[in-house]
């Protein structure tokens, strides 16, 4: 899901996030000193960071909501960014 959002958005920021995430995941796979549990933990943290970063981009946030099957907030539908809490 976190890979779909930056690919759908396609802005420079989301493309950089996607590139960095894929590079980090590739490096993680090649690390032979880490246990499988440590690799899984690191991968989860990378994904959480990617989701956080994508949510700070309007297009990325909307793509992430679509990927999750969630409706956009009223403020986002009106093009005003995220609704205030």
UniProtKB/Swiss-Prot annotation:
Heme keyword on record: no
GO cellular component, one term: host cell cytoplasm
Keyword Aminoacyl-tRNA synthetase belongs to the record: no
Location within or outside the cell: Host cytoplasm
Signal peptide region: none
Transmembrane segments annotated in the record for this chain: none
GO biological process terms, semicolon-separated: symbiont-mediated suppression of host NF-kappaB cascade
Domain of life where this protein originates: Viruses
Keywords recorded for this protein, A-Z: Host cytoplasm, Host-virus interaction, Inhibition of host NF-kappa-B by virus
Assembly behavior: Interacts with host IKBKG; this interaction prevents NF-kappa-B activation.
Record's function text: Plays a role in the inhibition of the host NF-kappa-B pathway by preventing ubiquitin binding-dependent regulation of host IKBKB activation by IKBKG/NEMO.
Entry protein name: Protein MC005
Organism: Molluscum contagiosum virus subtype 1
Gene this chain is encoded by: MC005L
């Amino acid at each position: 899901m976190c890979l779909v959002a930056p690919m759908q958005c396609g802005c420079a920021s989301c493309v950089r996030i996607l590139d960095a995430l894929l590079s980090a995941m590739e490096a993680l796979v090649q690390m032979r000193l880490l246990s499988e549990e440590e690799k899984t933990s690191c991968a989860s943290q990378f994904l959480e960071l990617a989701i956080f970063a994508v949510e700070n981009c309007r297009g990325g946030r909307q793509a992430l909501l679509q990927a999750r099957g969630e409706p956009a907030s009223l403020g986002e539908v009106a093009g005003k960014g995220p609704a205030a809490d």
